[in-house]
């Protein structure tokens, strides 16, 4: 990147092929007021940046400004220092792709309010998610010389409100002095304007009226506490830095969506990406936080009727494959995490494993396992079932392998609950579930071709596709090749090796293809 259009104030999801939502952007400009992103884009160099978990700074040479930022969970401070006496403009955009944003300048209380309605992607793409990202930005009016709102290039000086139109925003113009820093505080909420302001007050003023440097130090202390849950020593400092960089990045997802002082709730579980390593890591290093995440999943089941597979922006998505909220819940429970409602969690896990929504609209919206009836009836998902009500269609073999693992995980949950249950009839139900799910956890055998020893597509009549291409993507495999997915039997690697050991030796062509495999 060589051009900077502004600073996005958000809770960026970090990976998972998902877009940000409910955000707003703030741009700091020198001298000339330029409203639209393309107009205000200003050159910058990464050599002029400083970036830490608790602090960011960049020199905007053509604007004759130095911009610095620090942030806590719901609030931030933007600090701008002019190099010379000049006008300093602050441009604020609610980033509504649908042209449904709102912005208001409250000149009495010296606050800019706004919201950006959230819309779904994947299942129900473009539909309202039923909430907005709200923000407040507090400013010091002593050096304010102009303000207004705009739509596109249409400026309304001294205007106070703009809404439900594309490319809207507001600007504040201040008289800047060389070397004198200017600060703006912002607060966010996914609930309301009032909660955004309350979050700002709670995280700033309740800590003694934080200025930029005190907030920065407070944020640094929080990050040090988070990152030092694991202490690493190595003679190569670059490897230590790499480790802590990875730990820092994995700390963003899932993210907390509740307001300060409310019961903690998390959302945006990019589940297919995080159930293997990140969520199990949390059970080890931040067990209390892990339990809060698990209770958030339970809350989604209680409020919406189904345990989600890949919940984002307060919605079901059916993105990617598998039923890995069940795997995450089971993993947490068997590792001793107890600050979530395990029995209620099991209700949702069991429902996903054995049933599908009666109302087709609910299935379309992403509730329930995809193609669960095919999986139950056949012991695998046949190639004839194209799994059309999903963002990823087909991928039948990968789904079968992952459902088999999920069944194993739910079985472990059933066993753990059975062991602690005193009611004889309920113990019997857990035992029956365990027996069936353990049986189903061996369904991986139904998609590993016993002749070739590789994962393969299979028809409803039991015949194999007999795929010979091991290294290129196939429609029955998810984001990989058969040479990758064949090994996805973490619940029974010994059984997999036994099947492979008894398969037909590879011919020269297959061996050559295998030798070329690069993960």
Could you say what each language-model-derived stretch is?
Residues 1-327, 333-401, 408-419, 427-446, ...:
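Accessory carbohydrate-recognition regions in carbohydrate-active enzymes
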């Amino acid at each position: 990147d060589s051009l900077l259009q502004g600073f996005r104030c958000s809770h960026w999801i970090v990976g998972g092929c998902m877009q940000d939502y409910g955000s707003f952007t703030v741009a700091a400009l020198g001298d000339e007021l330029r409203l639209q992103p393309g107009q205000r884009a200003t050159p910058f160099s990464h050599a002029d940046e400083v970036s830490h978990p608790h602090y960011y700074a960049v020199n905007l040479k053509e604007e004759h400004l130095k911009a610095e930022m620090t942030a806590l969970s719901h609030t931030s401070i933007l600090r701008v220092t002019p190099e010379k006496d000049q006008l300093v403009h602050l441009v604020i955009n609610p980033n509504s792709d649908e042209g449904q944003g709102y912005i208001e300048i409250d000149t009495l209380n010296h606050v800019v309010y706004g919201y950006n309605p959230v819309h779904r992607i994947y299942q129900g793409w473009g539909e309202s998610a039923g909430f907005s990202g709200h923000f407040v930005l507090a400013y010091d009016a002593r050096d304010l010389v102009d303000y207004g709102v705009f739509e596109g290039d249409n400026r309304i000086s001294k205007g106070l409100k703009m809404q439900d139109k594309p490319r809207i925003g507001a600007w504040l113009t201040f008289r800047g002095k060389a070397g004198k820093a200017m600060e703006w505080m912002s607060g966010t909420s996914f609930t309301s304007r009032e909660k955004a302001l309350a979050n700002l007050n709670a995280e700033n003023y309740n800590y003694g009226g934080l200025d930029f440097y005190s907030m920065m130090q407070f944020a640094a202390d929080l990050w040090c506490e988070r990152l030092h849950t694991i202490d690493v020593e190595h003679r190569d400092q670059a490897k230590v830095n790499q480790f802590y960089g990875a730990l820092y990045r994995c700390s963003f997802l899932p993210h907390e969506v509740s307001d300060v002082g409310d019961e903690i709730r998390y959302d945006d579980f990019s589940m297919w990406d995080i159930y293997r390593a990140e969520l199990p890591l949390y059970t080890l290093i931040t067990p209390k936080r892990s339990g809060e995440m698990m209770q958030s999943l339970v809350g989604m089941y209680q409020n919406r009727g189904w345990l989600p597979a890949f919940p984002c922006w307060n919605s079901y998505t059916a993105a990617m494959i598998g039923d890995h909220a069940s795997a995450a819940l089971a993993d947490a429970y068997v590792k001793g995490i107890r600050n979530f409602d395990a029995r209620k969690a099991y209700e949702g896990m069991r429902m996903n494993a054995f049933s599908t929504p009666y109302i087709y609209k609910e299935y379309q919206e992403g509730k329930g396992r995809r193609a669960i009836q095919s999986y139950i009836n056949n012991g695998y998902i046949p190639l004839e079932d194209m799994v059309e009500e999903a963002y990823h269609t087909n991928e039948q073999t990968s789904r079968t392998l992952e459902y088999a693992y999920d069944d194993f995980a739910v079985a472990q949950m059933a066993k753990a609950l059975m062991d602690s249950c005193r009611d004889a009839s309920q113990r019997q139900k857990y035992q029956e579930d365990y027996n069936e799910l353990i049986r189903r956890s061996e369904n991986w055998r139904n998609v590993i071709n016993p002749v070739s020893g590789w994962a393969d597509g299979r028809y409803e009549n039991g015949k194999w596709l007999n795929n010979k291409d091991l290294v290129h993507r196939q429609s029955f495999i998810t984001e990989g090749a058969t040479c990758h997915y064949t090994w996805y039997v973490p619940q029974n690697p010994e059984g997999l090796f036994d099947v492979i050991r008894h398969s037909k030796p590879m011919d020269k062509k297959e061996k050559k293809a295998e030798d070329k495999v690069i993960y």
